[in-house]
C-alpha cells in the first residue's frame, strides 16, 4: 500500500506534528513499507496457532516504584498546543 503525501499530512495533523516537505516524503515511504509488511502478515494462515495474550509466558516483569523528580512546568508545557497558566487545555468531551 502506498500512502500519498496528502495522507501523510493528514496523519501528521492528527498527531499535531509539523513536517517539512522532505520529512513528508521520507515518512510516506517508511509508512508505506510498514503497511506493506502488515499486509504480508495478514496473508499468513494462522488457523492452527493457539491464541496468546502476551509474548512472555510469565507476563510483564514488574519493578518497584521509584520516586524521581518530574519536569519543570515550563518544560512540560513547552509543546502543548494550548495551555492556561501551568495547565494543559484539552477539548471538553463530557458535558
Swiss-Prot record:
It is an enzyme of class 6 (ligase). GO terms for biological process: glutaminyl-tRNAGln biosynthesis via transamidation; regulation of translational fidelity; translation. GO terms for molecular function: asparaginyl-tRNA synthase (glutamine-hydrolyzing) activity; ATP binding; glutaminyl-tRNA synthase (glutamine-hydrolyzing) activity. The keyword Iron does not apply. The keyword Nucleotide-binding applies. It comes from the Bacteria. Keywords: ATP-binding, Ligase, Nucleotide-binding, Protein biosynthesis. Its EC number is 6.3.5.-. Pfam families: GatC. It catalyses: L-glutamyl-tRNA(Gln) + L-glutamine + ATP + H2O = L-glutaminyl-tRNA(Gln) + L-glutamate + ADP + phosphate + H(+); L-aspartyl-tRNA(Asn) + L-glutamine + ATP + H2O = L-asparaginyl-tRNA(Asn) + L-glutamate + ADP + phosphate + 2 H(+). Belongs to the GatC family. Allows the formation of correctly charged Asn-tRNA(Asn) or Gln-tRNA(Gln) through the transamidation of misacylated Asp-tRNA(Asn) or Glu-tRNA(Gln) in organisms which lack either or both of asparaginyl-tRNA or glutaminyl-tRNA synthetases. The reaction takes place in the presence of glutamine and ATP through an activated phospho-Asp-tRNA(Asn) or phospho-Glu-tRNA(Gln). HAMAP family: GatC. Heterotrimer of A, B and C subunits. This is Aspartyl/glutamyl-tRNA(Asn/Gln) amidotransferase subunit C.
Amino acid at each position: 500500500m502506498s500512502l500519498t503525501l496528502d495522507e501523510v499530512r493528514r496523519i501528521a495533523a492528527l498527531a499535531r506534528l509539523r513536517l517539512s516537505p522532505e520529512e513528508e516524503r521520507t515518512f510516506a515511504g517508511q509508512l508505506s513499507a510498514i503497511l506493506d509488511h502488515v499486509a504480508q502478515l495478514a496473508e499468513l494462515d494462522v488457523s492452527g496457532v493457539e491464541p496468546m495474550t502476551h509474548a512472555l509466558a510469565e507476563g510483564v516483569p514488574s519493578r518497584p516504584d521509584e520516586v524521581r523528580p518530574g519536569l519543570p512546568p515550563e518544560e512540560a508545557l513547552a509543546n502543548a498546543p494550548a495551555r492556561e497558566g501551568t495547565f494543559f487545555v484539552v477539548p471538553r468531551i463530557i458535558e
